[in-house]
Amino acid sequence: MSAKPFILVLALACADARAEKTNFTSGLLAGINGVFDDLGSLAGGPPTVCHINCHHPDTIREALKKPATGHIAYLAKVRRIVEQQTGLPYAVVHYSQLSGGSLDRTRIKAVLITMMDKGISSNHTARLLATIRATNLPTFGFCGGHQKIAEAFGGKVVKMRPLAPGEKDPHPARYPGLFKEWAFLPVKIVKRDLLFDGFGDTVVVREYHAYEIKRLPEEFDLLASNDACRVQAIKHKSRLLYGTQFHPEHFDVEHPDGEKILRNFFKTAGILKPDTSTTERPTTP
């Protein structure tokens, strides 16, 4: 049996149905089969990458009707990236299974957090934020995960702004009437960090958002910014706890910076597999 460590991918998305998963017959996840692992089983299981999903169960049920697209395809993509970059297998847990110290009671060695849609309840959201505060594992949040990290420490997340009269909406189907970043866009590095090792002053990364962190908690440093959204990348001052407003998991041949940023995180966490490359076309989450 390999002695490689766990990674926990705290993801606010859906799950890859390829691996063997738990079938839930009761509770919030009733009827969602072949998607989630049991968090408790990871404590004594083999080293793995675990992706914690924070979407509403109804969103997941709807996504399962078209598994080749949307959230299911997105999770399959994240699985490929993580497994190829780290050499570790991959599991998925729903955020409703979390309690404050549940991550640290496993053999998990790192955490990734991605997007979130509508919450289940204020109690479940509070448990997620408590888990983020409690864990000492290396952690990296993307987009909605980045925002939840800030909220966990008292930060404020707001809509960016309304569209100006005559201003073009790059994606009217999502957040209509709001200004949004919705493309590969340049972001300026304002504080050097290992997350941006090997880059110059700017990275070009995929944005999908209409909300932003307006008030950054004092426990965090600002690492990257642009004119449209000041808080593009953050790091906790005393922990390996990162967030990016952009999506590093979305990259392609013409825009490879996200792949390198992920590699830098895995390297910082001590789990990077040497000589990995996973460049591919992006998939909308």
Predicted regions and their residues:
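Pocket-forming structural segment of enzyme catalytic cores
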Residues: G154-K237, F246-P256
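A short, charged/proline- and glycine-enriched loop
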Residues: L42-V49
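Boundary at the C-terminal end of the N-terminal hydrophobic targeting segment
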Residues: A15-A19
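Flexible gly/pro-rich beta->alpha loop and the following alpha-helix that scaffold active-site loops
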Residues: R80-F142, F153
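Acyltransferase
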Residues: T22-G40, D58-T59, F246-P285
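Short hydrophobic segments within beta-strands
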Residues: I52-H55
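Sec-dependent signal peptide recognition
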Residues: M1-V9
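Glycine- and acidic-residue-enriched helix-capping/strand-helix junction motifs
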Residues: I60-L75
